[in-house]
């Protein structure tokens, strides 16, 4: 059965029972299945042409038919992904190195061993290689016609020998930050420490759900489902590897080291380990240590003898992305609160001696998902909202007609509504005399479900002629998300034994944290506002940490030790959780416990 993608000028063969969302994912267009393909979120609406009739369908519920045309585009799947990180001057002493030796120096004296000669020529400790490497060594040691023997070493272990007439052999590595929504890869020449380029794209696992719980549920359906979601992340990584190598004009087989960070669910799915027990109390994973594989153990297009390392996890849903962020923080006694404003809402408090960490399960609302007109940070998303002299102002990604709100836009919009007296401290839209007296009263409306909404952009203001609204339900979703984050900050600090006034810096990590208006976030009670305590955004802190691990043997060792100074706290078991959480659903700059 043939299915066509006119906007891509492509067509593919599919099986009869395929869903539109599955077909889109197979061609590299993973749609935003926030609800895990259950048909509830309605974020995967797509136009199709079937039997000559154009219609809008839910991709996760609608089956393809022969000759169907699906009008999905790369832009529909593209989003505003943060690639930049805060460190530009990274230390350089990589785990993987290349030593280039002259064949003329490989002279074995009487009654000695070739490997001992090699060890004397390499200025570091060399352990006995694996059998396959030792066998390869015996084959290349006496080769004629070559001037140089390049020896690739990972840690203290030789992983490859390359006979050559070239004086030097450049080798490359990639540091990856695997997010629930997006994946970023940084390509380095690890003979020089030079960043060559970087590339990002959506995590193709988004076709199986927009959050970790949806993906845990899907993977837990059986081995076939687990393998499909494993293949999705491998395809994502393979595309990034191919793209960065193409841009740098290098062979993917010259990639000898890759390093990965991501939350605990991403780690399990990367390793094709069933994450079922992560989704059930007491939220246990298989292993939190750094895990190393060989390239040949994966379908990734790197050198099969190269190293593949997933950084260590910290406990529960707090994974290697948080470990990576902590690795990139200054190693001093300054007391910090670190907040990663993503779907899992990881939080850490402490200093270089001791950290407490927790995840807050704040949901996808702060990333624009799960809202009536929420969307990823892509073209058409409102990213900034304000009000000047009674007139609502906004800016749109791509400077096009507005389609909905991304995370930073929804925070600004809620702050504006609260500041202008359009919602009360408890989150209710105003009504009665307060509504009648308000100059923006005509922007309110009621939908078919008798739910009130407010028009941030009216149909008359929008070139596409549609209202862009925030409903009462959307306000509640933001209240729950911000309460989760703020409660996490309060209880984690209390468990650590400090008050808000003891903090010396608040650090915001992640893509959303980089785009958010900090003052608006503090105004609605999403972020703590503590007098004299600065708030600093570090961009993609997880990406910085992954690069540190790639480029420095010492940093990798420090990273592997972070779990030993870190205590994971399960916030939901704290006796104060419910009371604190309910208090923090209120809008306003709350006071930390």
UniProtKB/Swiss-Prot annotation:
Pfam families attached to this UniProt entry: RACo_C_ter, Raco_middle
Keywords: 2Fe-2S, Iron, Iron-sulfur, Metal-binding
Identification of the protein by name: Corrinoid activation enzyme RamQ
An annotated Gene Ontology molecular function: metal ion binding
Required cofactor names: [2Fe-2S] cluster
Task of the protein: Involved in the degradation of the quaternary amines L-proline betaine and L-carnitine. Component of a corrinoid-dependent methyltransferase system that transfers a methyl group from L-proline betaine or L-carnitine to tetrahydrofolate (THF), forming methyl-THF, a key intermediate in the Wood-Ljungdahl acetogenesis pathway. RamQ is not required for the methyl transfer, but it stimulates reduction of reconstituted MtqC from the Co(II) state to the Co(I) state in vitro. It also stimulates the rate of THF methylation.
Inducers of expression: Up-regulated during growth on proline betaine or L-carnitine.
Cofactor notes: Binds 1 2Fe-2S cluster.
2Fe-2S ferredoxin-type domain mapped to chain residues: 1-76
Residues that bind [2Fe-2S] cluster: 35, 41, 44, 60
């Amino acid at each position: 059965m043939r299915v066509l993608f006119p906007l891509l000028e492509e067509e593919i063969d599919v099986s009869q029972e395929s869903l539109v969302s599955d077909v889109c994912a197979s061609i590299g267009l993973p749609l935003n299945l926030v609800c895990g393909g259950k048909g509830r979120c309605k974020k995967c609406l797509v136009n199709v042409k079937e039997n000559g009739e154009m219609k809008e369908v839910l991709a996760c519920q609608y089956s393809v038919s022969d000759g169907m045309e699906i009008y999905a585009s790369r832009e529909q799947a593209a989003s505003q992904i943060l690639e930049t990180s805060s460190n530009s001057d990274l230390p350089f002493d990589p785990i993987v190195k290349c030593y280039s030796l002259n064949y003329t120096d490989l002279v074995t004296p009487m009654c000695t061993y070739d490997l001992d000669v090699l060890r004397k020529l390499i200025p570091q400790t060399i352990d006995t290689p694996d059998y396959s490497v030792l066998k390869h060594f015996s084959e290349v040691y006496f080769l004629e016609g070559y001037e140089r023997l390049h020896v690739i070493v990972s840690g203290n272990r030789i992983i490859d020998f390359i006979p050559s007439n070239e004086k030097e052999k450049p080798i490359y590595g990639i540091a990856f930050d695997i997010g629930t929504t997006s994946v970023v890869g940084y390509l380095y020449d690890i003979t020089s420490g030079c960043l060559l380029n970087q590339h990002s794209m959506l995590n193709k696992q988004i076709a199986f759900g927009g959050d970790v719980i949806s993906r845990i549920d899907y993977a837990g359906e059986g081995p076939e489902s687990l393998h499909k979601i494993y293949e999705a992340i491998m395809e994502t990584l393979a595309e990034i590897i191919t793209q960065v190598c193409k841009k740098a004009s290098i062979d993917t087989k010259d990639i000898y080291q890759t390093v990965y960070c991501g939350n605990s669910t991403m780690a399990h799915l990367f390793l094709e380990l069933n994450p079922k027990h992560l989704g059930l109390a007491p939220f246990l994973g298989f292993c939190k240590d750094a895990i190393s594989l060989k390239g040949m153990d994966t379908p990734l297009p790197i050198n099969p003898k190269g190293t593949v390392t997933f950084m260590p996890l910290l406990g529960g849903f707090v994974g290697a992305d948080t470990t990576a962020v902590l690795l990139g923080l200054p190693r001093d006694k300054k007391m910090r609160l670190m907040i990663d404003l993503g779907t899992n809402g990881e939080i850490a408090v402490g200093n270089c001696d001791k950290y407490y960490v927790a995840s807050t399960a704040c949901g996808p609302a702060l990333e624009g998902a799960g809202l009536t007109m929420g969307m990823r940070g892509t073209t058409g998303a409102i990213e900034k909202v304000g009000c000047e002299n009674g007139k609502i102002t906004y800016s749109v990604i791509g400077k096009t007609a507005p389609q909905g709100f991304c995370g930073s836009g929804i925070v600004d919009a809620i702050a504006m509504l609260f500041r202008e007296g359009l919602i009360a401290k408890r989150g209710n839209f105003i009504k009665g005399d307060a509504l009648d007296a308000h100059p923006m009263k005509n922007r309110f409306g009621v939908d078919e479900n008798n739910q009130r909404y407010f028009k941030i952009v009216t149909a008359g203001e929008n070139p596409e002629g549609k209202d862009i609204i925030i409903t009462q339900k959307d306000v509640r979703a933001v209240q729950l998300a911000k309460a989760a984050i703020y409660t996490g900050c309060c209880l984690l600090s209390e468990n650590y034994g400090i008050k808000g006034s003891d903090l010396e810096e608040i650090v915001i990590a992640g893509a959303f944290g980089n785009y958010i208006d900090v003052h608006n976030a503090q105004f609605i009670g999403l972020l703590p506002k503590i007098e004299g305590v600065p708030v600093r955004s570090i961009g993609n802190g997880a990406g910085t940490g992954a690069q540190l691990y790639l480029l420095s043997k010492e940093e990798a060792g420090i990273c592997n030790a972070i779990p030993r100074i870190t205590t994971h706290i399960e916030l939901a078991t704290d006796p104060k959780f419910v009371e604190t959480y309910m208090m923090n659903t209120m809008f306003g700059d709350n006071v930390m416990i």
